[in-house]
């Protein structure tokens, strides 16, 4: 999707389960567009300001086991995805799956 979007196009994302999937999708979009110019920490901090909920804050308590596991997976996935995006702006030339095959 990112490859086909014009720079000024907007993306609207919504999920109603409260697990943080919308936030993660938006962070991934931000990473794909800005990894070449911003650090991972800068992108995450900006997204925390936009969405001050639990999704990106590992210091907030999560009592639901499913949410806790999802948070742990997220904290491992996002830095890896950032490295992919830094090497492949806008998801090019390698797809995520191709990059993983070379970097796993």
Swiss-Prot record:
Biased composition (Basic and acidic residues): 57-70
Region listing for Disordered, in residue ranges: 51-70
Keywords: Hydrolase, Virulence
UniProt similarity note: Belongs to the protein-tyrosine phosphatase family.
Protein name per its UniProtKB record: Uncharacterized protein AvrBs1.1
Signal sequence, renumbered to the chain: none
Other facts noted in the record for this chain: This is one of the putative proteins coded by the open reading frames within the region required for AvrBs1 activity.
GO molecular function: hydrolase activity
Recorded superkingdom: Bacteria
Organism encoding this protein: Xanthomonas campestris pv. campestris (strain ATCC 33913 / DSM 3586 / NCPPB 528 / LMG 568 / P 25)
